[in-house]
Each structure stands twice: as C-alpha cells, then as structure tokens.
Amino acid sequence: IVLFIQFGFAQKSSYSPYSYFGVGETNFSATADNKMMGGNTAYVDSVSVNLNVPASLSKLKFVNYSVGVNLKNNRYSTQDNNAKTTTASLNYLSVSIPTKRLGFNFGLKPNTSVGYLLESVDETTDPVSTNRYNGDGGINSAFLGIGFELFKNFGLGISSSYSFGNLNHYHSKILTDVELYTRVSSESSLSGLSYNFSAVFQQKFRNNIKIYSSYVYQPESSLTSKNSQSIRTLKLDGSFGGDTENINLSLTGMDETKFTIPSFSSFGLGFGLDKKWFVGLNFKSVQGNGYRNEFMSLDNVNFNQHNIYSVGGFYLPKFDSFTNFFDRVTYRAGFKY
C-alpha cells in the first residue's frame, strides 16, 4: 500500500491552466467500462464493480482486481496561441471481494490534479518584467466500501474515503538582465474524510428484459488544509540565491484553513437483456459554493451548481462463443455533457 500511495503522489496527470483554481482539475473517476458508457451508474452485474456506487458490491459474485490508466489529450487555444498537452496517469486501483452476506472493496484513486505554467510579459516597464505562475500537486483518496442486499433485487452500499495530498502554487517575478529574481511559494497539505451512500435496484420484466436503477448521494465534506508561505531569492538557473523569508501565517489565521468539497447526487436508469445489451442514462447534480479555500481564494472566481448528463450502453453478440473472438467482445459507447 505504501508503494501505491507514493505512486499516487508522484504522478502528474494534468497540464491545464484551469487546474490553477480550487483543488485542481477534477478527475473523471470511473472504471474503463463505465467510462465507455459515459459514466453510467445504473448497470450492475456479478463480475464487475462500479467504484462510484458501493451498492454494486451487493451483486458481486467473483473476486475483482481492477487497475486503470488514463491517457488524456487536451488542446487549448486563444486568439494568439495554441497548445496541446498529453498526460498519462493512474486512474484507479481496486480490489473487490464478495462474501456470503456482503461484498467489500478497497483501493486508491486520484481525485484532482494540479499542473500549469502561465506567463505574462510587461514590456512597458524598464527593465521588462515577466510574471510566471506555475503549480503542481493534487488530491488522492484511499477508499473502503461495502455493499449488501437488503431485499431481493435491492442493494445498499456505503464507502468511506480518506483524502490526502499537496497543492503547490508558485509566483515568480523576473526582470530582464537582472541576475536574481523572487519567488513566492504557497503550499498546502490537505487531508480529510468523506462518505458515499448508494442504492441499486433491478427488476426483470417480459422476455427477460431487466430494468436497472441506481441512486448515489455524497454529503458535503471538508478537508483540513495546513498552509505555509515563503519568499525566496533565486538565480536565473533556478538555484538558491541566498535569501529566504518564511511568512508567519498564524498572525492572520491562514496557517490552517478548511477546504469545502460540495455534495452531489446522482441517479441512473436503464434497461437491457442480461449478458446481451444495455442502454441507460444518468443525471448528476453537483452543488455550488465548494472548492473554496480562504488561503488561495480569488475574488472574481465562483464555483456554481452544475449538472452532468450522460447516455451509454453496450452490446455483446454472444458471450459464450467458442468459435468467434469478436462475438465475445463487448462493444460499448456513450457520451456525457
């Protein structure tokens, strides 16, 4: 587990100017098969687990080991410049185990990531000055979930996550032809607990068609942020220039602050034929006023309530075919907005 946590800290999964805000760029946390269906949460079977729906563990019949790697390509453009970035990172690591009365799982997944480099040049000053903003870090979580069947076709689940990580933001002011420059470092170490509650329901109708439904609710939680800030003189090659001043944040009460993670609820609904096909939709609502930290607050930035819609499904020609490989392949498609 120590190796997993170290890897979680070491990876860099974002190169985005938007990761400057809040706790960074939010990771689309879902297994590969769920992602391919747009993030649908309704479908549950006996061999796979939905990491966002701990109630799916109530249907698990076989031990499940899951590892996911995320490859992301982004393109950013302004009136003057275009940029492309490619990042690869661990997306999830999970072990799920069924027992006679319930199923449980544990694992590690990254929640957010920070990675940006922004520069603005002021040629009206003498000497010309450059303001450089860069950052790194992110938040990961170690989770433990259980799911059990309360009634026939109806399962409940709960998961607990311990979130941890570091957010580092740096502001450098560089003057042309001046050997030294100053850099302000603002660093935060965050940790805290969150909980996730869910329910799943399945019912078989005519011609063995099944209706699948799910509900997920995660209440608002907070992370404790222990902060530090310093001003350092550096040489142009990045080496230490000789002066460092540590700012006493306790004088302003900024040495320890709270970071709010907003609540969300999600509802999924779909229908299909077991081991053959499935079509479903999902609705997720994330409350506003979250992702705010007094230590790194911005007056002109707000985090508002937003909704996410997704539709997806799969088709499996013949799951027990021994003669044709492509008949055993599951074809998935989906999108989210």
Question: Can you name each region flagged by the protein language model?
Answer:
Residues 11-337:
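Subset of outer-membrane beta-barrel
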